[in-house]
Amino acid sequence: MSRLDLRNGSVEMVHGSGGRAMGQLIEELFARALRNEWLDQRNDQAQFELPPGRVVMATDSHVISPLFFPGGDIGSLAVHGTINDVAMAGARPCYLAAGFILEEGFPLADLARIVESMAAAAREAGVPVVTGDTKVVEHGKGDGVFITTTGVGVVPPGLHLSGDQARPGDRILLSGSIGDHGVTILSLREGLGFEADIGSDSQALHGLVAAMLAAVPEIRCLRDPTRGGLGNTLNELARQSGVGMQLVERAIPVREPVRAACEFLGLDPLYVANEGKLIAICPAERAERLLEAMRAHPQGREAAIIGTVVADEHRFVQMETPFGGSRMVDWLSGEQLPRIC
């Protein structure tokens, strides 16, 4: 049997049949790129030891369009997104599983590029992909490739971060500028050209989280503002904790190209997706120390204290404008940017 034609070949239905062709796809493409001691065993599952602590599991499905974009692709995004979901519990991400839905006719060169990007992201993060699965659907029944990743991590004993832990008086911190990922994807999709000055912020944040917890173990909540952006995520946290939030608009970092693109497109950057930022809520007396720790880390250099948790039975999120007024930051109504991750 000849080797896979990774330059000119494409995915065929036989690649999902469970036979020799599927084995060849796994061996010559997936296993070669993602190689590690668990995958090398060629079992249908991975067996591993975990350090002491509570086990955290998160799963995420990725349907982003386009598949490739400045700052990443669906492969690296699948790794980063799931690692970040695990890390927001304060956990150390340990292992990943990946499932691929491939469309018949999808170029093998593009698939190889995606898998190699996934492998590079996993290596950089130190979180291996230890098991996986591949299915093929008929041409026209998919959209190239969809990826589902599941992550397993461990929370150290004594640590408990949750979205229901915010208390009145706490400070709200943001790790950096918002809207980069969403504007990049929309601009590329519509051929607007803004992505040349921006690029996705997709990155794994567990290193930043570890540095933050080492400095301020009293952190109450962590959350990454992905779909729905900062505005939706803060409403989620307010609802979970039964509190209100008061933001300061001028304190929220937004890069000028993102601000300009949002004004042109009629978007509010508060609701534009991010893939490499986090929100932290901590006691007021520890906020400056946490800010210092975040800014000392490469992924938190633009960090800012953006608001305060307040007592509010209605659980409203409100924002002070630069002109001294106040406006409601409500839940996003409808879908502002579909297939953003």
Swiss-Prot record:
This is Carbamoyl dehydratase HypE. Involved in the maturation of [NiFe] hydrogenases. Along with HypF, it catalyzes the synthesis of the CN ligands of the active site iron of [NiFe]-hydrogenases. HypE catalyzes the ATP-dependent dehydration of the carboxamido group attached to its C-terminal cysteine to a cyano group. Belongs to the HypE family. The keyword Lyase applies. CDD domains: HypE (cd02197). Its EC number is 4.2.1.-. InterPro entries: HypE, PurM-like_C_dom, PurM-like_C_sf, PurM-like_N, PurM-like_N_sf. GO terms for molecular function: lyase activity. It catalyses: C-terminal S-carboxamide-L-cysteinyl-[HypE protein] + ATP = C-terminal S-cyanate-L-cysteinyl-[HypE protein] + ADP + phosphate + H(+). Pathway: Protein modification; [NiFe] hydrogenase maturation. GO terms for biological process: protein maturation. The keyword Signal does not apply. Modified by HypF, which adds a carboxamido group to the thiolate of the C-terminal cysteine, yielding a protein-S-carboxamide. The carboxamido group is then dehydrated by HypE itself to yield a protein-thiocyanate. The modification S-carbamoylcysteine is found at C341.
